[in-house]
């Protein structure tokens, strides 16, 4: 989570230079992993018109496959993510955006990444607090995979 910038940047997350540097880092990591046959998950802030999102970028063979946005932001104890970040609302549809030199990148929570060579392998992502709520994004992922991936027998 937020491995590009670090989790404790506080109000520096509002600085455009930090946001641009994080986006450029994704582009550079994509270029450097072009020959790597592994999914790479990278945490970073993503600035959009409506706010800044705590996200995970997913890379494979030099391509940005998706940007997962965190929905549930902790605001207790030492956590105050709602000060800097906007939650991606459950009722928001997946958007397709341009980011880090890539076009039509899925941005949201309800994103499934399917292996082109093995349709029985499907991956999704959720970030930290999203896992610990009563109905996490992964519950929707599992339901969708069950509906989409049921083998014909």
Region locations from a protein language model:
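Enzyme catalytic cores with a strong preference for nitrogen-chemistry domains
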Residues: 1-153
């Amino acid at each position: 989570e937020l491995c590009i910038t670090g989790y404790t940047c506080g109000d520096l997350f509002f600085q455009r230079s930090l946001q641009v540097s994080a986006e450029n880092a994704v582009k550079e990591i994509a270029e450097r992993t072009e020959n790597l046959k592994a999914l790479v998950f990278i945490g970073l802030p993503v600035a959009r018109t409506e706010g800044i999102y705590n996200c995970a970028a997913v890379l494979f063979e030099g391509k940005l496959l998706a940007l997962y946005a965190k929905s549930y932001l902790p605001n207790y104890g030492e956590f105050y993510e709602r000060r800097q970040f906007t939650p991606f609302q459950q009722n928001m549809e997946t958007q397709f955006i341009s980011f880090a030199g890539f076009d039509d990148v899925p941005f949201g929570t309800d994103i499934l990444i399917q292996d082109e060579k093995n349709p029985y392998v499907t991956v999704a992502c959720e970030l930290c607090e999203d896992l610990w709520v009563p109905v996490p994004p992964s519950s929707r992922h599992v339901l969708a995979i069950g509906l989409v991936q049921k083998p014909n027998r």
